[in-house]
Amino acid sequence: MMSLRSAISAGLLVLCCSVPAVAADAWVAEWDMPNGLAELRQGNFKNIFMFAAYFDRQDRPYLTEDMQKALRGGLAASLAQSPNKGPGVYLSVVNDLLVEAPGKSIQKDPGIVSRLMATEASRAAHRKDLLALLSVYPFTGLEIDYERVNIDDWPRLLQFAQELSVTLAAQGKKLRVVLEPKQKYLQGSLPAGPQYVVMAYNLHGNHNGPGAKADDAFLRKLAQWCAHWPVKPGLALSAGGYAWTARGVVDLTERKAAAWAQGAGVQPIRDPASHALYFKAADNSPGSPLLAKGGTTGGSCEIWYADGETLASWAELGRSLGFGDVSLWRLGGNTPESLAKISGK
C-alpha cells in the first residue's frame, strides 16, 4: 500500500468526493460522553449504542457512574434535540474487567467469557444479570461485544446469544452481536435470531506499522469470509486514526488529526487503496496533540486517519459486497461534515 501513495489521480479524487451520505448507527462511549452526546444532536443516526457495561470481580456486568448519569438525563436531552427524534437505544456490554485498583483492569478478558459460558447454570445467571441491566432504561435492545473469545467457548457463546435473542424478542427487544474481523470467528455458521455486525477495522493500529484502519482489499476479504451466512451482517467502521511516533502509536480523532495537519502546514494525501488520509509532521509542530503530553523532540510522525469521505467510501463498498447497516465507532471528535456524510443527514 505504501508504494501506491503517489498514484492518486484527479479522477479518483472526484470519485471520492461524489460518494453519497449514508444512514448509520453509532456508538457513544462512556469515557467521552459529553462529546458523544453533542454529536448525537448533530447527526441523523438510526440507532445509538451506549458503550458500555463492564464486569466486576464477580463476573457481574455493571454500569459506571458516568453511564448512569447519562441515562438519567443527558441521553434523553440529546435524543430530543437530534434530527431523528426516535433512534433506538441499545446497551453494549463488553468483556472488560474494570476495577478501581491500579493495574487490575483487563480489556477484552477471554476468561470472563469462559466462566460465564461454562455451565448451564452460569449461562442462566449471566442472562438474568443482562436482563436486569436492561431494566434501568427503556432500551431498544442489547449488544454483546465479547472479544478475544477462546475458540472452544465460541459455540457456547453463539448458543447463548440465540437463546437470549428469543427471550428479548418476547419483551419486544433486540440482540446484536459484535464479531471480530478474524476468520476463526467468521468462517462458521451463525444461529438465526440475533443481529450481527462485523468490525471492519484494526487492519493497522497499535499492533503494527503505519496505514489505514481498513482498505478495499480488507473489506473484500471480510465479505468472502461472511458470504456463506444466511443472515446479512452489519458493518462497523471506525472513525479517526493513529499517529506512529518515536514513542509509540497514539490514537487520534479526526478533529485532532486535521488540527495537526493544519498546524503543521501540511496537506493530507488521500490513499487510493483505502480512501484514508495520511501525512507526516513533527511531534512538536503547532496543533500536535502530543505537545500536551510533553517530551516532544521534533521527531517525525506518520499520521493516518479517516474522514467523512473515507467512511462513506467504505460504507458504499461494504453494501455493494452484501453487508447491511453501517455502524460508526464512535461519536466524539468528528467534524460536522463527516457526521453529515455518515449519518445520512
Question: Predicted regions span which residues?
Answer:
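Bacterial N-terminal signal peptides
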Residues: 9-18
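Glycan-recognition patch characteristic of GH18 chitinases/ENGases
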Residues: 22-124
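Short, acidic/polar
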Residues: 29-42, 120-135, 180-187, 307-317
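Catalytic domains of carbohydrate-active enzymes, especially glycoside hydrolases
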Residues: 34-58, 130-142, 317-325
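Substrate-binding surface in catalytic domains of secreted glycosidases
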Residues: 57-70, 154-268
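Glycan-binding loop/region signatures in secreted carbohydrate-active enzymes
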Residues: 99-113, 239-314
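Active-site groove signature of glycoside hydrolases
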Residues: 126-156, 202
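Extracellular low-complexity, Gly/Ser/Thr-rich intrinsically disordered linkers
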Residues: 291-344
